[in-house]
Structures are given as structure tokens and as C-alpha cells.
Amino acid sequence: MSDNILVLGAGELGTAILEALAKHPSRANAKLSVLLRPSSINSTAPEKKKQIEHLQGLGITPQPGDVESSTSELAAIFRNYDTIISCNGMGRPFGTQTKLADAVFEAGVKRYFPWQFGMDYDAIGTGSDQDRFDEQINIRKKLRAQNKTEWTIVSTGLFMSFLFLTDFGVINLEQKVTRGLGTWDTKITVTVPRDIGRVTADIVFDPRGIANEVVHIAGDTLSYKEIADLVDERFGEGTFRRELWDMETLKKQLAEGRPVAEYKATFAVGKGVAWDREGTVNMARGIQMTGLREYLKDVNLVK
């Protein structure tokens, strides 16, 4: 089933998945391709050229195409592949993921990994503060309503690096603040892209019965108090002050139109954003993952 694999996009996650697929011991004769805009493939910019050369060095073929194309144009490309993995999520216009799923169905692709590397949208449910979540739930309905394309959704939680984004605010290295969202006991699952790539590649080449279902992986699952404790352990107690952004505070941020306020509110509720590591694919398969304590070893204070 995985003889001809197309990954959509070569951003942080796409590159991590491509590298893991290329290096997987069960790759055998599987052909790997990555969908990139022709302008990216033919770019003379040093960084772009370096990236293309790196991917080609791993035996990955650039496939010209653009996810902004029409459904039928995308289907014409997808028709040549057995497995498609969508890593085109961040910053894409509303409706892009629905169009990609429709193109996959139209092309008759055998297996699809949609861009759902994040929260468990079934658990969050419709009507949240984030409209894009409703689109993801509707895509799940589409997948479940058909039987021609096998699908797998890999729920990963938040990218671990997002904890350190200033707008998200959980670990602010510049202000030396750790924050809880909702309550200090609310939990969050976080995973680094490299580990997402490794586990996804393992599912692609060795599914072990995983099909037409949502699976979970986790680098770490912690409460915000546990996150703050690990930050203190790394940088010394008293270096960071603690601040709680409860639901009332986050609702004010939402009303003020603050950046990523919808996401913070979702994580503060704690539904569909955290799961026990014991029930994850990585634990079942004995795949070692990067936890927050280990990740923090490479994090330094902003001077």
C-alpha cells in the first residue's frame, strides 16, 4: 500500500515526516515525493536550494503542485500515489483541508493521513471558539462516511516549541514567567515534530492493524503546574514567577482580539488537548520520545 508516498509540504512537520520515512528500516522500495510549488523547486534562494538538495539526497522527489489549486487539479496529481500525508496546515485559508480531502477521494487514493496532527477534535466537539476546529470535525465525518480511502489520524497534542511562543504565553523566556491556562491542574499534551515524524513513519510502514481510526501519540502530558516545576528545575527556583490565566482572563483576551486567544481558551478548557501517555502508539511500540525535561536542556534564557 505504501509503494508510492506523497507528503504535502516541507515545513517543520513535513520535513520531519519526510526524513523519518526516508530513514525508516522498512522503507524498502517505497518511492517518496513531496508536493512543492514550482517556484520553490526552482528557487535560486540559498535556503530553498539547500532544502531541495537535502530532500533529494534522501531519495525524495519534488512533485510540482500547489494546494491552492482546484480539487480536480490536485486529484490529477494525487492519482499517482498510494499514500498521501498532508502537512499543509499552518496558515492555510479556511476550506483548504476540506478541498484536500475531496481531492483525495476524487483521485481514489488508497490511504490518507490528513492534517490533524494536533488536538483530538472529536473530544473538543463543534461550536468551540475556533472555527477551524469545526472544519476538522467535518473532515472526520467525511472520512467516516466513505469506504474507498483508508485513513489514519495522528493526534499529537501541541508542538512542544509552541509552549515558548510569546503569544501563547505558557513559558515566556523574556519576561521570565510561566503561566497556567484555566487552572494549574489542567493538562496539556506536547510532542516535538521529529518524534511525530518517527511515529507517523512507523505507522505508514508498519500499521499493525491501524486503519480508519484516530490514534494518539505524546512526547509528554503535563499539568501547567508540572510545566512550571520543570522550568524551575532547569533555571532555578525563583527565576520565573508564576501567573494564572483563568477562563475570565482568557475571555477578556478573546474579546480584545488578542493573538491566538481562541487556542489559549481551548487549552484552558482542557478537553481534547491531553491524554495519558500509557494509551499512545509510541508507548505501545516502545518508541522513545522527547519529554519536556529533556527539551528544556537545550533552552536558554533570553538575555
Curated annotation (Swiss-Prot):
Binding site for NADP(+): 8-14, 36-39, 56-57, 77-79, 159-162
SUPFAM superfamilies assigned: NAD(P)-binding Rossmann-fold domains (SSF51735)
Induction description: Expression is induced in response to 2-benzoxasolinone (BOA) exposure.
Name of the featured protein: NmrA-like family domain-containing oxidoreductase FVEG_08287
Pfam family membership, one: NmrA
Disulfide bonds listed in the record: none
GO MF annotation: an example: oxidoreductase activity
Keyword Acetylation applies: no
Family: Belongs to the NmrA-type oxidoreductase family.
Purpose: NmrA-like family domain-containing oxidoreductase; part of the Fusarium detoxification of benzoxazolinone cluster 1 (FDB1) involved in the degradation of benzoxazolinones produced by the host plant. Maize, wheat, and rye produce the 2 benzoxazinone phytoanticipins 2,4-dihy-droxy-7-methoxy-1,4-benzoxazin-3-one (DIMBOA) and 2,4-dihydroxy-1,4-benzoxazin-3-one (DIBOA) that, due to their inherent instability once released, spontaneously degrade to the more stable corresponding benzoxazolinones, 6-methoxy-2-benzoxazolinone (MBOA) and 2-benzoxazolinone (BOA), respectively.
Extra facts: Fusarium verticillioides possesses 2 unlinked loci, FDB1 and FDB2, necessary for detoxification of antimicrobial compounds produced by maize, including 2-benzoxazolinone (BOA). The FDB2 cluster arose as a duplication of the FDB1 cluster with rearrangement and expansion by incorporating additional genes.
Highest taxon listed in the record's lineage: Eukaryota
Source organism: Gibberella moniliformis (strain M3125 / FGSC 7600) (Maize ear and stalk rot fungus)
The EC number(s) this enzyme carries: 1.-.-.-
This protein's UniProt keywords: NADP, Oxidoreductase
